[in-house]
Design a protein with these regions (language model features):
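Glycine-rich, mobile lid/loop segments that gate access to catalytic sites or pores
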Residues: 118-154
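N-terminal alpha-helical "arm" segments
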Residues: 1-27
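Sequence/fold signature of self-assembling virion shell proteins
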Residues: 2-10, 143-182, 189-194, 200-302
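Short, contiguous, pocket-lining structural segments
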Residues: 79, 102, 106, 162-165, ...
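Long, contiguous amphipathic alpha-helices that act as assembly "spine/axial" helices in icosahedral shell
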Residues: 75-133, 195, 280-282
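A generic local secondary-structure boundary/capping motif
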Residues: 75, 183-185
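Assembly/oligomerization interface modules of large self-assembling protein complexes
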Residues: 25-83
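Generic structural "secondary-structure junction" signal
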Residues: 80, 96, 128, 136, ...
Length: 302
């Protein structure tokens, strides 16, 4: 349905001092703090995790050498979604508006809607990361204590007990990440990179990572997290996280959180000869997800 003069009655008459409601500031591309972006030329993308070899055994004198097998462990799949929206203006609404350019006004509003949706889609991967049914290539949720390994063991990228963000829980996460292994149970020397928090935890994050001394104690101990550079990239606030208690760590494990861009944002317009209406649309195709769940650590909070 086209935007007509019926929706813009006040703008057909002189005397308005201001038009407002479409010029609010917006949050930036917060997904870039979490995801690695790659381009895609297919309707979907797949990435397969490989399993190497176990620790080498001792060979006894005169005995045969031991052989091991590498294999594929599992495959993660990214299905791109098409995100699109448009609006239409009647010829008369364009002609009779006394104030500003309707097309310029609403194309800005359209861009805002498209950008907002992208951030919601990106944050949804974390928001649903603890929810059964939102599984990755290994058959479990993004944040799980049972990421099974080819060797028969498991990796966990959640605390043993859901914990609020504090000094103890953050230090425990750093230690836990350092103990992750590959598919054959060899240590992988993983490290945290960045703390990602909702707005409600921004001040907690500042105190934990940026103060010189320990937080909330009467002791004169140093802040070990800051002194050791345990979270080298500091913290980022994501305003699209829905749980005010949940917090996350990105890690240096490669091929973790991925954003595939199938078709970049495209804007177009055309006119209808019969009605005189002018139509505008925006369209893009992308996907958000994860390949290796060890690219993130998460706690749902206590």
């Amino acid at each position: 349905m086209a935007i007509s003069r019926a929706q813009l009655l006040k703008e057909l008459l002189p005397g308005l001092n201001a038009l407002f409601g479409l010029e609010y500031a917006k949050y930036g591309e917060e997904h870039k703090e979490i995801y690695e972006t790659e381009s895609s030329e297919r309707s979907f993308e797949e990435e397969t995790k490989l399993s190497g070899f176990s620790a080498a055994p001792v060979k006894n004198e005169g005995s045969a050498i031991a052989y091991d097998n590498g294999q594929e462990a599992w495959t993660a799949r990214y299905n791109h979604e098409t995100i699109a929206m448009g609006f239409s203006l009647t010829e008369e609404a364009i002609e009779d508006n006394l104030y500003d350019s309707l097309s310029a006004r609403y194309t800005k509003a359209l861009a805002r809607s498209m950008a907002y949706t992208k951030q919601v889609k990106a944050a949804a991967v974390l928001n649903n990361g603890f929810t059964a049914g939102y599984n990755g290539g290994d058959g479990t949720t993004l944040f799980s204590a049972t990421h099974t390994l080819v060797s028969g063991g498991t990796n966990s990228n959640v605390p043993s007990t859901p914990s609020d963000l504090n000094e103890t829980s953050l230090e425990s996460a750093v230690i836990q990440i350092s103990l992750w292994t590959d598919e054959r149970s060899l240590l992988i020397a993983a490290k945290p990179r960045k703390l990602v928090v909702p707005p409600a935890l921004q001040f907690v994050a500042t105190r934990l990572l940026e103060t010189e001394l320990r937080v909330g104690t009467n002791y004169n101990d140093i802040n070990a997290l800051k002194n050791n550079g345990s979270i080298p990239e500091g913290y980022a606030i994501n305003h699209f996280l829905t749980d005010s208690n949940a917090w996350f760590l990105t890690t240096d494990v490669p091929n973790g959180m991925k954003h595939f861009e199938r078709t970049p944002l495209q804007n177009s317009m055309d006119g209808d000869f019969d009605t005189g209406n002018v139509r505008y649309k925006s369209r893009e195709r992308y996907s958000f997800g994860w390949s290796d769940p060890l690219g993130m650590y998460g706690s749902a909070g206590a």
